[in-house]
């Protein structure tokens, strides 16, 4: 797996957006509560703060994210474009596309990922992760650029399941959550342990108001991601996000220690509901 800067691989960076919905350890019946809207959202990325140790001097890019409710589950499509400028003057561009699906019970997750950058050929891998009772055991299987099978713990959660769970926790007034998450990444980075802190609900007062997408309030949520099984006290990365009760994220910041990346919603629209009758 190539590196975009020392100590951090591409999928760890990309997963930091898509799996900012990832850290609870609550039963899958959480699926029956929070209502997440089908929507497409576009985000603009920019460099946040950096310290004297940061080799990356500037970041620019765009993210397009589509979450669509289907009769048997949820489809999720992500497109990323990043441009990194290093202190050496070197500029690197990265493109990534991910197409995934999660069943409505939160027990099956499939993914198809394509990545390329300015100095390596395209990498393509597909696979799935499955949990009981859909299967006798919890596991993830890969093909393509990676040919591997992982044994998972049964308390792993997938993205949409987690999104609903964390919103439910916020509505219940819970302040902290932790658990294991399966992230749509390479086998070595597939599972993360995350600790989330949920802040007090705040009014949404941005100039960007999108009918049906943005709501009148949000919760500030701070999630720290750790490599599974590690005893390290410092996370690999940390995310601060503004999460609305319909599952929409309007603003987030990824903190890698030496620097931060800021993303803000630029436009979005609702997707018409599927008739499952």
Question: What residue spans do the PLM features occupy?
Answer:
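N-terminal secretory signal peptides that target proteins for export/translocation
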Residues: 1-10
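Bacterial N-terminal signal peptides
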Residues: 11-25
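A short, structured loop/turn motif at beta-sheet edges
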Residues: 32-38, 66-75, 101-107, 212-213, ...
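Residue-level recognition of well-ordered beta-strand positions that form the cores
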Residues: 44-46, 64-66, 79-81, 97-101, ...
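Mature, soluble, non-transmembrane domains
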Residues: 112-277
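Short, surface-exposed coil-to-beta transition loops
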Residues: 58-63, 93-97, 121-125, 234-238
């Amino acid at each position: 797996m190539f590196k975009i800067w020392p100590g951090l691989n591409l999928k760890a960076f990309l997963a930091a957006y898509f799996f900012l919905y990832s850290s609870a350890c609550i039963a899958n019946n959480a699926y029956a509560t929070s209502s997440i809207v089908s929507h497409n959202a576009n985000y603009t990325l920019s460099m946040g703060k950096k310290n004297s140790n940061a080799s990356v001097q500037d970041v620019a890019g765009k993210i397009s994210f589509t979450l669509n409710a289907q009769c048997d589950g949820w489809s999720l499509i992500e497109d990323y474009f990043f441009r990194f400028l290093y202190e050496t003057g070197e500029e690197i561009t990265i493109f990534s596309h991910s197409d995934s699906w999660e069943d409505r019970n939160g027990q099956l997750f499939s993914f198809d990922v394509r990545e390329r950058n300015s100095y390596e050929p395209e990498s393509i891998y597909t696979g799935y992760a499955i949990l009981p009772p859909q299967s006798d055991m919890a596991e993830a299987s890969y093909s393509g650029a990676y040919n591997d099978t992982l044994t998972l713990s049964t308390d792993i959660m997938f993205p949409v399941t987690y999104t609903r769970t964390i919103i439910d926790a916020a509505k219940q007034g819970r302040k902290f959550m932790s658990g294991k998450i399966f992230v749509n990444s390479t086998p070595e980075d597939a599972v993360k342990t995350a600790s989330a802190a949920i802040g007090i609900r705040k009014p949404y007062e941005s100039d960007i108001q999108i009918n049906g997408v943005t709501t009148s309030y949000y919760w500030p949520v701070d999630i720290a991601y750790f490599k599974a099984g590690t005893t390290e006290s410092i996370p690999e990365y940390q995310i601060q996000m503004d999460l609305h009760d319909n599952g929409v994220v309007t603003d987030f910041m990824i903190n890698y220690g030496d620097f931060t990346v800021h993303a803000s919603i630029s436009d979005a629209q609702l997707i018409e509901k599927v008739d499952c009758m």
